Amino acid sequence: MSGTKVHNEHVSTEELPVAIYHEEHLTISEAAFVTEVGVAHGVGIEAIVPVRVVRTRIQFEDLAHEPIVVPNGSIHHRNETLSGPGDPWLLVHGARGLGAWTLAARAGVSIPLGRTEPNPFDLGRRGLPHQHIQFGTGTWDPVAGVSAGRRFGQVGFVVHALARLVFGTNAHGYQAGDRFYASAAADRRIAGAWRGIAGLDLAREQTETWGGHIETEGNLGRTDLLASVGVARPLGRGAFHVTAKVPLVTRATGAQVDYPVILAVGFSR
């Protein structure tokens, strides 16, 4: 399970005759249910089903950042809580030893079950209420990843890379941006059965399009470098871990969300 709070601020002139700030605060939570089954020596099938909850709170402010009331509300934002499944992943994965290293790879597809919304920018231009939050891509997207790990005395080390590629558009004309992820982490015993984990994560999201066109807002591309720290330990027949990821560097095009930290809690067996 993971969660974060994000903030987005932008100026609009659509609700009132004068420009006002939209101060949007979102709390995003996701629980991912993962199951694996072995089908041959070193080969297995993995299914990942995410369930998301997004809580949105909006405040309107004048240019001096004093709260104001918009009598007729906004077609863009509202106080609401959305929930539902994201796009599940179905993957084949394999692993093998190579000297002191363990190498692994997985490949599969994301299944378009997450809710998608009509073009919010087109609806906004027509003065109609709309929704920007997408729970899925609406397309079957290939997913592939590789990892390698080994131990150096008391220290474990692992590197990981993953890509989700989007080649088509969904029924609303939406094509999500490709996503790339890489990480490197080391772990070491710190107390009893507890192990400390520290690493770096790099995430890249390409530009989304609607009807083949890039809009002036939305996901226009961003790159995030994050530091991660956490602890893990065996628990019964499984393992428990807690991780915090803090953004170090963000490079984004256009007005995009900011977040202070991502917290993740997991249990596996």
Regions flagged by a language model, labelled:
Residues 1-30, 62-64:
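Surface-exposed strand-loop-strand hairpins of Gram-negative outer-membrane beta-barrel proteins
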Residues 7-13, 169-269:
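Outer membrane beta-barrel transmembrane domains
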Residues 31-39, 47, 90-94, 107-109, ...:
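Residues on the lipid-exposed face of transmembrane beta-strands in outer-membrane beta-barrel proteins
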Residues 38, 44, 89, 102-104, ...:
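Membrane-spanning beta-strand positions in outer-membrane beta-barrel proteins
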Residues 54-176, 219:
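Outer-membrane pore/translocation modules
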